Regions:
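Signature of soluble extracytoplasmic/periplasmic domains of secreted precursors
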Residues: 1-171
Length: 171
């Protein structure tokens, strides 16, 4: 599993995250890689979760493509089977707090009700809450030409899903 998350933080900033399902050994591999790159690797702990920085600029974009270019600073941690990458320790701490406090989509009743209409098996899922008015983010800049922001501001949930079968995509 691989995901890209863009949130509109209460600070007014857009925070971007890349989430990759992985085993805990991935942290050890990344830490070892860091030791070979820099003499002073970044290391911190927040609420019992170790935070690191991978000192390879734009590594996610280079490995995964331009969709992941918004995460370029590569601060990361491992939580419940997932590597989480973002641009700052503050953003990562916010993610950790939300996860530990269960303030995520998995625990959101509106999202749970909405996902009853979404297949649990898909290759690509885009989910957005346009009513949050986060239309200034990089993701939405490309959509402004064909989307009336006022109309979309009244929509609480929007999803687009792609699934493959026999080398064909279905939505």
């Amino acid at each position: 599993e691989l995901g890209y998350i863009s949130t509109f933080a209460s600070s007014g900033n857009t925070e971007n995250y890349v989430v990759i399902q992985s085993k805990s050994e991935a942290i050890d591999m990344l830490r070892h890689l860091n030791k070979n790159i820099t003499e002073n690797p970044y290391n911190d702990t927040h609420r019992g979760v170790e935070i690191y920085k991978l000192h390879i600029p734009d590594v996610l974009q280079r490995v995964l493509g331009n969709l992941f270019s918004a995460v370029y600073e590569n601060y990361f941690c491992w939580i419940n089977g997932y590597l989480i990458f973002t641009n700052s320790p503050t953003a990562l701490k916010t993610f950790i707090n939300s996860n530990l406090s269960r303030k995520t989509l998995a625990y959101n009743i509106y999202y749970q009700n909405y996902t009853e209409n979404i297949s649990s098996k898909c290759n690509y899922l885009f989910y957005s809450n346009p009513s949050l008015n986060n239309w200034t983010s990089d993701l939405y800049k490309n959509l402004k030409d064909w989307v009336n922001v006022e109309d979309w501001s009244n929509i609480n949930a929007f999803a687009f899903q792609l699934t493959t079968n026999n080398e064909l995509f279905y939505n």
